[in-house]
């Protein structure tokens, strides 16, 4: 498949499982593109991005959320895989072919986003903001996406990038280092024996939502949080990140037990920033 074949012309409407809906909703008159990175070569969970979770392929979860957000104008899957591309198209997303060198186990997602934004700019796309939604974090909600975009575009702040975080299960002061079989606290001044309530709280970066100004994306580097980053907090129930078979089974359990549905009505967590 070629980039020309996969990058569809821009149009005011898109057919999706949610019906035909306008793509003219904007934030402060600025266009927003949702990017879903989904390569075909997962090794820990083979064919992970097209594996069914809760009745639909994993890659469709972020597509549906993007379609439900009134802030997002285009939803584009970047992939090297024909089956993923076909699944994305059938569910109302556009597709851009990812070069093989950007789809290896060692490839960085930021490089795939650089390729995508360069392709979009060459195609005449003038969007100001990009939101990345990884399929491996399926339980994000529209509120999570909109909270990141609202923080990114808040006139009272100057963030160039925003991402979702969740409270870590383990305090950073309870991490250990083991050198030649000898354990020691990972942080020199930490006391891992103190009760949990007396330990500092740490936060984990999730794969649920990243949002940034397209023109602020650095030409080099590995981080998707740059310049003055902001954070949106989300509950752990929505922050499930599927990297292993055990993670997938856990996500299935949340659905089977109805835990995800019950938690899905929670308000998006508070926002935080570096300043």
Predicted regions, residues:
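Low-acidity, Ser/Thr- and Arg-rich intrinsically disordered low-complexity segments
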Residues: 2-6, 11, 16
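N-terminal nucleotide-binding beta1-loop-alpha1 segment
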Residues: 20-46
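Conserved alpha/beta core of the MobA/IspD/sugar-nucleotide pyrophosphorylase nucleotidyltransferase superfamily
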Residues: 27, 111, 202-275
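Conserved SAM-binding loop
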Residues: 51-52, 77, 132, 240
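A short, N-terminal amphipathic alpha-helix
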Residues: 58-74, 86, 90
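Short active-site oxyanion
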Residues: 71-76, 160, 237-238
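Short phosphate-binding loop-to-helix
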Residues: 82-131, 139-150
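Conserved core of the sugar-phosphate nucleotidyltransferase
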Residues: 111, 138-228
């Amino acid at each position: 498949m070629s980039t020309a074949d996969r990058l569809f012309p821009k149009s005011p409407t898109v057919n999706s499982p949610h019906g035909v809906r306008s793509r003219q909703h904007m934030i402060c008159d600025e266009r927003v593109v949702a990017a879903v990175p989904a390569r075909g070569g997962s090794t820990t969970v083979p064919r992970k991005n097209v594996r069914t979770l809760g009745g639909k392929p994993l890659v469709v979860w972020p597509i549906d959320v993007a379609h439900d957000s009134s802030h997002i104008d285009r939803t584009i899957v970047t992939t090297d895989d024909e089956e993923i591309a076909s699944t994305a198209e059938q569910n109302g997303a556009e597709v851009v072919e990812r070069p093989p060198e950007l789809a290896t186990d060692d490839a960085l997602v930021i490089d795939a986003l650089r390729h995508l934004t360069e392709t979009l700019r060459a195609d005449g796309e003038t969007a100001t903001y990009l939101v990345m939604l990884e399929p491996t974090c399926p339980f994000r909600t529209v509120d999570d996406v909109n909270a990141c975009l609202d923080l990114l575009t808040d006139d009272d702040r100057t963030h160039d990038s925003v991402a979702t975080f969740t409270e870590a299960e383990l305090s950073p002061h309870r991490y250990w280092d083991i050198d030649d079989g000898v354990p020691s606290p990972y942080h020199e001044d930490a006391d891992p024996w103190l009760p949990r309530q007396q330990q500092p709280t740490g936060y984990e970066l999730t794969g649920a939502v990243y949002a940034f100004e397209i023109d602020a994306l650095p030409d080099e580097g590995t981080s998707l949080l740059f310049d003055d980053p902001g954070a949106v907090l989300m509950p752990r129930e929505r922050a499930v990140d599927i990297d292993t078979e055990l993670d997938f089974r856990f996500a299935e359990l949340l659905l089977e037990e109805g835990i995800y549905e019950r938690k899905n009505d929670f308000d998006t967590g508070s926002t935080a920033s570096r300043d």
